[in-house]
């Protein structure tokens, strides 16, 4: 029976409760006098029951007993290099190999050179990862200050970072950051840092030098929000200690002549072939070409003059393969590191800079340890009697043998030895201890393959065509300069916004008022604790073999730092408002804070106003409820 609307009485319900449940009903279309035919046919419309109204559900949370708003302000050196090193990746110095070279030891007296050269660690592009532990290490090196201490606080929240990029005089550069990444992506960052690729990245910022923009010399400020994996919920400092907050990279860029260079070097990068993995050749080789090291060791007579370097075995002027093997012991394990020698250019620069003064030659080998990416291309066993023989030990030409530097034991003069490719392999010595070669016969393909010898820049890209891709800085290599090139230094300033929370023990440390407590000299890192150990203390859980530990004694007897005079970097006495408070709030969300740029006559009022704005912002972020948000409680 069809459902019809009655012309009289009460209107019937669209849905009728029947034995089989609710049944759908359809409207009855009546003909209208004003339209007889319709272009589109009518469809039956269904009366549907309205769903249940979503009701908001309030989720409440409580903040810790005590809150501390902390701003970490400091600076980073992001690029350190010389002209001609823009294609090299910056790397930290290997203190064991590069910065500490013992050339003489007489009893307990050790003569060494502990200073490194810019060539050993410099580079025109760099990358890194920022974490709370890294900020603590920077504080110990006097490179940042903490407005409030984290000592005694168990919990922490992160609200983002602000970075200020300063333009240089003559060199433009790119700065890039990423907050969502994994460890595998971070290791594959070399190809992504090529200037033509990074120029298209979403989070990259181009900083033009002052020479190109003489009028607009403003400092560019960017805000980096917290990672998507983090929310504004509280976390223990031990959990957030090594969590990567963001990943960054910085690289020099050439905007005047991005495509061409002079005729002395091959630069037809647009003619390079496309590889099987989809990358262009100049992108594939970016960051994977080692520096051009010396092919000759220093003269033995000059190097051993005065009775030093007694373990230097070569005689005369010895030619070598440009990549040497540094053999040492780390953690009771024999390790081989590949490095290049740069005594030639540094000796040349020193003698030219001094002018009238007559300097002696260097008494140590200037070594630069190759990074993992620079040893990407290696010789195979089948190439020993092929391409490798044609270049480095031809039958009727000059031979470039393998050089090993044995730094075992640590506080002794290293042993420098040379191994000919045409001679027999000894049954004992360095080759047996570190490479397992002791056949006592001529070199074979299998013996050469066990070395895993990296390819030098002569074999990978001696013409420098790959490193001269689009937008790369095009300058002759630093090794070919007659005098020392000019340095390039780029640095940034940062401000991190954290909030520490917890409930520390009551202050029990009382100082003698008759004893002087000087503000100077500055006690830099006395009030900041490593995030891994922050908040740990007490007698029951911190008793070692010799009694109460140092951390427990400090927590029991020391007053909690809560003023500027007790902060990491001691400032002048200031009047503070009470920030440690109790509060009950709902979940909050991190919002980016901004600081205005400009100039003012009264700097004190400007700093005070900025401080009040930041305190008010952090207070609103911590105490803002979420009653106005509607959520469906479905669990």
From Swiss-Prot:
Entry GO terms, CC: T=1 icosahedral viral capsid
UniProt-listed InterPro entries: TTvirus_Unk (IPR004219)
Region (Disordered): 571-608
Role description: Self-assembles to form an icosahedral capsid with a T=1 symmetry, about 30 nm in diameter, and consisting of 60 capsid proteins. The capsid encapsulates the genomic DNA. Capsid protein is involved in attachment and entry into the host cell.
Keyword terms, alphabetized: Capsid protein, T=1 icosahedral capsid protein, Virion
Main location class: virion
Protein family per UniProt: Belongs to the anelloviridae capsid protein family.
Low complexity composition-biased segments: 585-597
Keyword Isomerase part of the UniProt annotation: no
Stretches with biased composition (Basic and acidic residues): 573-584
Compartments in which it is found: Virion
Protein name: Capsid protein
Domain of life of the organism encoding this protein: Viruses
């Amino acid at each position: 029976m069809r459902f019809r609307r009655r012309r009289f009485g009460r209107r019937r319900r669209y849905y009728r409760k029947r034995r089989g449940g609710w049944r759908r009903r359809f409207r009855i279309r009546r003909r209208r006098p004003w339209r007889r035919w319709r272009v589109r046919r009518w469809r039956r419309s269904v009366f549907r029951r309205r769903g249940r109204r979503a009701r908001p559900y309030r989720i409440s949370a409580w903040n810790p007993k005590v809150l501390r708003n902390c701003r970490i302000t400091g600076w980073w050196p992001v690029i350190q290099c010389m002209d001609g090193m823009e294609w090299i990746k910056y790397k930290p110095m290997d203190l064991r190999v590069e910065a500490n070279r013992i050339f003489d030891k007489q009893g307990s007296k050790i003569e060494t050179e502990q200073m490194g050269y810019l060539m050993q660690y410099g580079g025109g592009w760099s990358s890194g990862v920022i974490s709370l532990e890294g900020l603590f290490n920077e504080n110990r090196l006097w490179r940042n200050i903490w407005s409030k201490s984290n000592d005694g606080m168990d919990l922490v929240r992160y609200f983002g970072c602000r970075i200020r990029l300063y333009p240089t005089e003559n060199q433009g550069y790119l700065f890039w950051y990423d907050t969502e990444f994994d460890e595998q992506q971070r290791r594959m960052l070399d190809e992504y840092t090529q200037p033509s690729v990074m120029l298209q990245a979403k989070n990259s910022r181009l900083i033009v030098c002052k020479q190109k923009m003489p009028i607009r010399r403003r400092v560019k400020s960017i805000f980096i929000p917290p990672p998507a994996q983090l929310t504004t919920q509280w976390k223990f400092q031990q959990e957030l200690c090594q969590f990567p907050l963001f990943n960054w990279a910085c690289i020099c860029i050439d905007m005047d002549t991005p495509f061409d260079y002079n005729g002395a070097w091959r630069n037809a990068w647009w003619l390079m072939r496309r590889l099987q993995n989809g990358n262009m050749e100049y992108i594939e080789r970016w960051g994977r070409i080692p520096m051009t090291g010396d092919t000759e060791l220093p003269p033995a007579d000059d190097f051993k003059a005065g009775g030093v370097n007694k373990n230097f075995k070569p005689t005369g002027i010895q030619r070598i393969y440009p990549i040497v093997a540094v053999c040492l012991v780390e953690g009771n394990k024999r390790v081989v590191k590949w490095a290049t020698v740069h005594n030639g250019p540094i000796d040349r620069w020193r003698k030219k800079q001094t002018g009238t003064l007559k300097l002696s030659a260097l008494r140590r080998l200037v070594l630069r340890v190759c990074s993992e990416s620079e040893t990407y291309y290696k010789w195979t066993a089948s190439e020993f009697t092929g391409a490798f023989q044609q270049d480095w030990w031809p039958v009727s030409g000059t031979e470039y043998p393998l050089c090993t530097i044995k730094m075992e034991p640590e506080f002794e003069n290293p042993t420098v030895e040379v191994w000919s490719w045409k001679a027999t392999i000894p049954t004992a010595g360095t080759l047996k201890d570190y490479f397992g070669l002791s056949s006592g016969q001529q070199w074979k393909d299998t013996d050469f393959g066990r070395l895993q010898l990296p390819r030098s820049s002569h074999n990978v890209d001696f013409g420098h065509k790959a490193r001269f891709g689009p937008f790369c800085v095009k300058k002759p290599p630093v090794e070919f300069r007659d005098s020392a090139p000019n340095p390039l230094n780029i640095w940034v300033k940062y401000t991190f916004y954290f909030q520490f929370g917890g409930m520390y023990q009551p202050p029990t440390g009382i100082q003698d008022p008759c004893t002087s407590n000087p503000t100077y000299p500055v006690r830099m890192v006395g009030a900041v604790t490593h995030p891994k150990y922050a908040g740990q203390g007490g007698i029951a859980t911190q008793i070692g073999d010799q009694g109460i530990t140092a951390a427990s004694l400090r927590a029991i007897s020391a007053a909690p730092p809560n003023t500027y005079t007790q902060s990491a970097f001691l400032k002048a006495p200031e009047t503070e408002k009470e920030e440690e408070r109790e509060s009950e709030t709902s979940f909050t969300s991190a919002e980016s804070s901004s600081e205005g740029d400009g100039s003012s006559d009264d700097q004190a009022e400007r700093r005070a106003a900025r401080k009040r704005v930041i305190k008010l912002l952090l207070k609103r972020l911590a105490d803002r409820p979420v009653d106005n948000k509607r959520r469906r409680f479905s669990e």
